[in-house]
Swiss-Prot record:
Subcellular locations according to the entry: Cytoplasm
Annotated keywords: Cytoplasm, Gluconeogenesis, Glycolysis, Isomerase
Species this protein is from: Xanthomonas euvesicatoria pv. vesicatoria (strain 85-10) (Xanthomonas campestris pv. vesicatoria)
Function: Catalyzes the reversible isomerization of glucose-6-phosphate to fructose-6-phosphate.
Protein name: Glucose-6-phosphate isomerase
GO CC annotation terms, alphabetical: cytosol
């Protein structure tokens, strides 16, 4: 990005604005609270407290045009091979809508719709049984997305199925889950793109034995034959996924089977509709008015021009408590790259460390550091305008904290006592959902997906591979024999010492 024609001008704006007070930016642009706000369907975004002005934004958009961001979105939606290292498309958008005239994308949409029909039929079959509980086994993209959506949208009472998620290879996770369940009234779903994932195979074996066989086991995989063979699952209970959908972008596919069981098939389809609505906004809206573009460019500005190494996400709705964990994978696995598409080294820092939690709990843990620490941490504050619970006073208090915390972070407060002085200057974006509906959540997740893609285009990296996760898995596989007491050649001296400790 630093090699673009417009970078020097952008850098000059950063030098000018780095020490600017956010109240001064608001005073200089009186219409800023509304001019820096956007509404897309049930989602409202306010960027007014970010540390840029119109001139800096114009420079950011100039680089986005130089990087052909609009063309990059066309290539993504049309099913071109944007995942160049694996020579694949990234057609997660086709799982939820048919927005182009590209045959590849239209065929993918039709294929996904057919699989959803099969999934709906399997749900109807399960509803006709005595099964009350579902254990969903997967990890990473096969777990974080479904777990987030199921937790956010599950009904308070009256759900047909209780869905339990197990991801960690630690046997304690499976033990605690199964201890509360009756095998005669439980079904299992094994989700793995390759069906070679260690965690899913080990946990799947435990679940298979506990259920007494495969009669109530289902699978979702891009390798359905291997899935069926590994656990003797009938082919009719195996749903496909595809190599043109990355795991962290797959909750819209049959990977969403546990979502549909937890919240109902109709509401699962509404989730997809909300995502498709936001996709249409991204595809058809000019860059300057495009929320995902503005969100992604803001992340680039904070990372590369203002030097922020981390980004916090605070969800002021307890039902969205898992969103920061989901976004950690979406953002950091997608953007944690050190080489560009052509294999050359990047010319700027890439991904920030994403972290966060649910408000107001986080105000009593890490907000001290946000307000008075030496690091400036940009943040997203996410809340809901209307709540579904009967405790209106609690919701008013919750939203008062969103308003207060974002104001305090931005404006600060002087004091003659340095221990009680707040420097301010901490930028944040406020995102408000009209209500936490499937459509709104679908749109919110879609926005973050596209924001990630914007950042990848600006940096010239591939957002759709994840080779960085492989080496550790390979080494773990090689070390298994040594941990079991078998002879093994372990070259690393520290690993040898740790092995001796573990083997007693």
């Amino acid at each position: 990005m630093t090699q673009t024609n417009g970078f020097d001008a952008l850098h000059a704006h950063a030098q000018r604005l780095r020490g600017a007070a956010i109240p001064a930016l608001l005073a200089a642009e009186p219409q800023r609270p509304t001019q820096y706000a956007r509404q897309v369907g049930p989602l409202y975004f306010n960027f007014a407290r970010q540390k840029y002005d119109r001139a800096a934004l114009d420079a950011l958009f100039a680089i986005a045009r130089e990087r052909d961001l609009a063309g990059a979105f066309q290539r993504l939606f049309r099913g071109e091979q944007v995942n160049v290292t694996e020579q694949r498309a990234a057609l997660h958008t086709a799982l939820r809508g048919d927005l182009t005239d590209a045959p590849v994308a239209s065929e993918a949409y039709a294929t996904a719709a057919e699989v959803r029909q099969r999934m709906g039929a399997l749900i109807q079959q399960l509803e006709a049984t005595e099964v009350t509980d579902i254990v969903s086994v997967g990890i990473g993209g096969s777990d974080l997305g479904p777990r987030l959506v199921a937790d956010a949208l599950r009904p308070v009472s009256g759900a047909r199925f209780r869905v339990h998620f197990v991801s960690n290879v630690d046997g304690a996770a499976m033990q605690r889950t199964l201890a509360t369940l009756d095998p005669a009234r439980t079904a299992g779903i094994l989700i793995s793109k390759t069906f070679g994932t260690q965690e899913t195979l080990l946990n799947g074996s435990i679940l298979h034995a506990w259920l007494g066989g495969s009669e109530r086991l289902y699978a979702v995989s891009a390798n359905p034959e291997r899935a069926a063979k590994a656990f003797d699952i009938a082919p009719g209970r195996v749903l496909p996924m595809w190599d043109w959908v990355g795991g962290r972008y797959s909750l819209w596919s049959a990977v969403g089977f546990p979502i549909a069981l937890a919240i109902g098939f109709e509401r699962f389809e509404q989730l997809l509709e909300g995502a498709a609505q936001f996709d249409a906004h991204v595809l058809n809206t000019p860059l300057e008015e495009n929320v995902a573009v503005l969100h992604g460019l803001t992340a680039v500005w904070n990372r590369n021009l203002l030097g922020s190494a981390t980004h916090a996400v605070m969800t002021y709705d307890q039902r969205l408590a898992l969103l920061p964990s989901y976004l950690q994978q979406l953002v950091m696995e997608s953007l944690g790259k050190r080489v560009k598409l052509d294999g050359s080294a990047v010319d700027s820092d890439t991904v920030s460390v994403w972290w966060g939690g649910a408000g107001t709990d986080v105000q009593h843990s890490f907000f001290q550091a946000l307000h008075q620490g030496t690091s400036v941490v940009p943040a997203d504050f996410i809340g809901t305008v209307h709540n579904d619970d009967p405790y209106a006073e609690n919701h008013v208090a919750l939203m008062a904290n969103v308003l207060a915390q974002t104001e305090a972070l931005a404006n600060g407060q002087d004091s003659s006592d340095p221990h009680r002085s707040y420097p301010g200057g901490r930028p944040s974006t406020v995102i408000l959902l009209d209500a936490l509906t499937p459509q709104a959540l679908g749109g919110l997740i879609s926005m973050y997906e596209h924001s990630v893609y914007v950042q990848s285009v600006m940096w010239g990296i591939n957002a759709f591979d994840q080779f960085g996760v492989e080496l550790g898995k390979q080494l773990a596989s090689q070390l298994l024999p040594a941990l079991k007491g078998e002879a093994a050649d372990v070259a690393d001296p520290v690993t040898r010492e740790l092995l001796s400790k573990l083997r007693g």
